[in-house]
């Protein structure tokens, strides 16, 4: 392969407001497997990851901790690097948006865009979601909340700079049409097209209300808004706009940006629009993968449903966790993490299939041939079948990796491993060993098994980087044997094997599930206690003191007359039907009976409640609210349900007991 064959792959840069969890690890391990495989193919790879360290949330977290924002992120970034080291992540460069060279690049980019008229000063009036760091207009909100995360938004009114995203709407649509592989999976591309066609707004790219950010060089009271800062990392890390690195011409454009689906919009609309404005080449592909779910929802530290990858690696081994993430989750879709799935995958694939094949093969080689077997030609149909599977494996895995169907690549590898295990049962080496006349046939069988292990071991090196060398070692080979060009049957003439430790000891399922359940309960209890303490501290902090002591003026909503309040009709209603809407991930469509008639209510609570959780329950509604057309008039919502925000950013609903009649007035 020629020296100029390069491959540039990036993870999103992670927000270090707290330690990362297994969901973040999923993205990075997937990128690592792709990077390792490309290196095995002979590519000169640049694998970039890093941290996005500016913004309101970091500023607030640091203030709560009594340290500067830089001191706060320094501590978290150290844990991020430790985690990637633990998970055998082979990144080539780690960028921090607080690095001087990155800030220099961002300021040059911002200035260039301003001077050519693609950035202008204006006034932002709208809404801001702090957790998502996103700005929204009235029409984009869902039930008055952030359409991405469902949390409360804050009114924002400040002077700001804007990037002319709207200017590039037609070019973006043309990009998608002419480059159908630019956005993957296909469903995500359709979402982006719909978002643009509904009317693309210019993007706010500075904030005066946030102090922790890169200052606009010609107007320093304006720190840059997160996305211009964050997105530019993909080129600043290569030396664009700075003299720290000099790899831009070699590696840009990126071959693959891997991101979570929640930030795909910024990477496929704002980022290419910025690059168009800068007259720079566009990345070749952006892949928006799904979420790793637990207990039916996205992992969240505040809910207490996160999984610490460090604990998992300590208990089961790094490669077991890497394998689970890469094999279990359908790439591009959401996937579920459960303790049962993890243990069953380790036992069935790693301990039973792979581990048993290696241990049985090595043991038989030692028992029947003193540990040394040589190439002996196969003479039966099942030999040719196994040889064919071995010889065709690399092409299948390569196609899957190129298509980003990583679980399918592992399925192909393990199909050969499973076929080799079946081959043992079919050839019965222990029976062949009883007759000296079968010695050549016996050696041929064991050689076929060694070859199956060698070739699958080479390919597994991209996914299980500490296991593959162990496999080679037990086969009597060194690390140089992990050569993709040698993944053909017969490439290794002789094996001198020796027994080693079990690759993946089998786990007692019942015992382990009980242990993990206990640990889960402890973690949830700790999270609940922490949330309660946080809420109590916040309440105490905000509690009004006596006027003569504090002089604090607490602002409330304007008073209304008692007669006006009496006009609001509050009643108990029974949920008779409830379903998700195909058109919205946020809304539930409820059919409720208020004692007189059934009515339709649309409510933005789909993130926290499943339809089956609500059917048959009695809830409070505003019964005389004027009907409101929603979803472009397709539905009409005839009321509003009672719901409250929880301390952790969730949602709770007041349910009424059996002794409360449907239709009762709420006073």
Question: Which role does the model predict for each range below?
Answer:
Residues 1-3, 37-44, 65, 69, ...:
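Secondary-structure transition/capping motifs at alpha-helix termini
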Residues 2-76, 95-111, 115, 132, ...:
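N-terminal catalytic cores of NTP/NDP-binding nucleotidyl/phosphoryl-transfer enzymes
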Residues 2-49, 101-105, 149, 155-367, ...:
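Structured secondary-structure scaffolds
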Residues 78-92:
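A glycine-rich helix N-cap at a beta->alpha junction
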Residues 116-169, 173:
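Cys/His-rich short segments
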Residues 121, 127, 328, 333, ...:
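Helix-rich, typically C-terminal accessory recognition domains appended to large enzymatic cores
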Residues 468-564:
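Intrinsic disorder at enzyme termini
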Residues 540-667:
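Phosphate-backbone binding interfaces of nucleic-acid-interacting proteins
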